[in-house]
Amino acid sequence: AHFFIYSGHGSNMGKNGTGGLVLKDWITNDQIQNELKLKDNALVLFKSVCGGAGSSAGDNGDIGYKEAELRVSDYAEPFLTIGASTYYANNYGDGCVSFLEDFFDGLSIEECYDNSLLWGVNKHISKNYMYQPNLKIAISGSNANSGTHTVISTDSNGVKKSRKVPNSKSYSISYVGNPYFDIGEIYKKKRTYVMNWIKSDSYKI
């Protein structure tokens, strides 16, 4: 498959307690890496998956940049290891649809990502990917509105629960991959993209 799209529960079946899939059975990162067959340069999209873009429905407040980066990194790792070009996660409505529309229009991964950032969404992280430093990881979300609250609803084995938590910084749109990859390269042999960092918020090729 050139496109793998998952919309379901988050999982703790990867290393560091994040990663994997929840289908009929729980699927580990190792199973994805050893059993899933993707075409070279495939795109992997996660829609509204707890932890997939950073934030999870079970969070109590701001998880912090490091935890958000670790979650996204661990979800993405097995797919990128087996040849995917890009991992993209979006917790907003039709965010994945808009991303794909832009990709099919010929935009690069980074352009698709930038276009998917809604009003009020801020860029939190943009740096080398910890497991493959030749790739980029970017994470965005909203900042906290002090004095306000959000109602979190969860459904576990048919039991629905709601709780009110203070609003905090969220991590809701993320990607890992080559920012310059576009649909014109999807059938080409994978090429190497290298980032040389000057400082934390800028880079050159």
At which residue positions do the language-model features occur?
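Active-site-proximal C-terminal subdomain of hydrolase catalytic domains
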Residues: G54-I205
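Catalytic-core segments of thiol-dependent peptidases
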Residues: A1-D59, E67, N143, Y175, ...
